[in-house]
Amino acid sequence: MPFPVTTQGSQQTQPPQRHYGITSPISLAAPKETDCLLTQKLIETLKPFGVFEEEEELQRRILILGKLNNLVKEWIREISESKNLPQSVIENVGGKIFTFGSYRLGVHTKGADIDALCVAPRHVDRSDFFTSFYDKLKLQEEVKDLRAVEEAFVPVIKLCFDGIEIDILFARLALQTIPEDLDLRDDSLLKNLDIRCIRSLNGCRVTDEILHLVPNIDNFRLTLRAIKLWAKRHNIYSNILGFLGGVSWAMLVARTCQLYPNAIASTLVHKFFLVFSKWEWPNPVLLKQPEECNLNLPVWDPRVNPSDRYHLMPIITPAYPQQNSTYNVSVSTRMVMVEEFKQGLAITDEILLSKAEWSKLFEAPNFFQKYKHYIVLLASAPTEKQRLEWVGLVESKIRILVGSLEKNEFITLAHVNPQSFPAPKESPDREEFRTMWVIGLVFKKTENSENLSVDLTYDIQSFTDTVYRQAINSKMFELDMKIAAMHVKRKQLHQLLPSHVLQKRKKHSTEGVKLTALNDSSLDLSMDSDNSMSVPSPTSAMKTSPLNSSGSSQGRNSPAPAVTAASVTSIQASEVSVPQANSSESPGGPSSESIPQTATQPAISPPPKPTVSRVVSSTRLVNPSPRPSGNTATKVPNPIVGVKRTSSPNKEESPKKTKTEEDETSEDANCLALSGHDKTETKEQVDLETSAVQSETVPASASLLASQKTSSTDLSDIPALPANPIPVIKNSIKLRLNR
């Protein structure tokens, strides 16, 4: 298929006439010949990764969507006739399939699924969609693997149509007929709709709005393809695990296009890393000024919603109702992504100076050589069908474990690898399906202390409790569904992972990327003495943006000012070496650029977390004590770089365990001694106590008592575990690092 490359002449003769974004562009410079050559090289580099679909396959998708669209129209006519609508209405009743996501954006890859939306008039009910339309799909020869998920947060029908996976949502509009030229961006369409229809419409509305807010769609698409591939190769593409999903990456690329409206893909990729390695999080990324439609729908607004002030990396969807697409981002995942942005900037600097090729940007660093300590999570189920359900649930809650680990006073970073792996069987004679995730840990370096005792038992058990509670209440729990956790050192990973996964990668050049300190301690990510490669690892590169002058008088515990204010400041980016060659952005100019950001969203520095004692019981899961209510205003100290994050005001705080109680309870666990690591490999002595993971049946009398039970941070509306016996995995992970 053709790959459009905007030429120098066309950009100069047809500059964008519109003003895009909430600020003025940083540069209007037109591309040079070297930029066009670099863009062509970028395309050639991307091709082997399968990011471009062949024209034949694209036409096949169009044909399938056409058949699906005809089925929808036919079905709606049948429904209309069954409900005795006038013939004049039936003839023009319409109905339509819309697409959204990567396919609608034009950046889908080979074999990717299609996200679709079925839009119907007001006399067609959601129940019709999940009954008569489902039955109609079942009769189609091309349709395989048909299944309905009616109880999902966004109800969906999933199917495989002639080999293409399709997810179909449903929305009923308050219209008598559905015209062919219907524009879903019209906010008036949301009137009198139920919340499920609004959620279903949101994907299409956001996708269409993004495409209308970029200066050049072809340049946007090619840049987004490159950034998505880079994010996937660097294991930071996963909304569910606290990184960014497809729509978030699309909005970041769209904002870059707005700031450099005449630039082409090679320049835009470089500017993407420049802008977001300098971004003053948690200032929000906005593609347009939020608009109020007076429909009383909840929108992202830190002035109104206290929890919105605690979002760490807000990227706001442009369509009403505006939402933060990155609410899952944690301290650790933001640190990882910011460090990757910095490394991306260093590499693209080299590329623009002809010191490196594009392939270097897409080299995948080896996650399993980054850290000395890892937590391995194992999820197992007796059948493949149960494994799929169980793995989906466990994966959706891993971010809760990461959040709990990073609040531990001894942990600097908890980095989960978005990839899951098949786990070795526990017994070759037993049929069992197991999936494994790996979390890299960096422990805080302590000064004036010889010993560092770390007890992760509570963090693991709290996570396990949350997953089991969700499984039981969703009626998917089976007795043989298990979760296990273990601590392993880097050199022990070969016992769990295949050799090709652990293969060492070529060392990246990261000249100009400096690792910063967190909590006045450097990150201990050095390699074992026998390891020859070194991959720069995430650090606390994040910087807390100061309060602006207008907000300083309000006090830190007052609501955050409006992000919709028209005033925007230009925050001067720190100095960066901009390549002198092959750059269309004034190579002879200053070495720093002004990155426009919304200065009306100040950084909210949360209060330091308290240390609360906790006791590990040998007969039941440990549950946190109720956290103090966050409704009362709390005076927050001045911003501190790297301060430990607390939960949102309306959430509970995880208690900490004192050293005394840790020593007392260590006698209750059956521990397995393993060796560990310290910074100095030749002098380290690490006593690791890891209790064997046991499956216990907790009797009703010893089960979680309601009076002791508090809700999870993610499941505040879920009741306590039932009194009947259930298997509970005991996970005791205790480490004593002797320095």
Curated annotation (Swiss-Prot):
Residues 650-660, 676-686 have a biased composition (Basic and acidic residues). A motif (Nuclear localization signal 1) lies at residues 490-507. It is found in: Nucleus. Mg(2+) 1 binds at D113, D115. GO terms for biological process: co-transcriptional mRNA 3'-end processing, cleavage and polyadenylation pathway; cytosolic mRNA polyadenylation. Keywords: Acetylation, ATP-binding, Isopeptide bond, Magnesium, Manganese, Metal-binding, mRNA processing, Nucleotide-binding, Nucleus, Phosphoprotein, RNA-binding, Transferase, Ubl conjugation. The record marks F153, K158, N328, R399, D524 as: Interaction with RNA. PANTHER family: POLY A POLYMERASE, POLY(A) POLYMERASE ALPHA. This is Poly(A) polymerase alpha. It comes from Mus musculus (Mouse). The lineage of its organism: Eukaryota, Metazoa, Chordata, Craniata, Vertebrata. The gene is Papola.
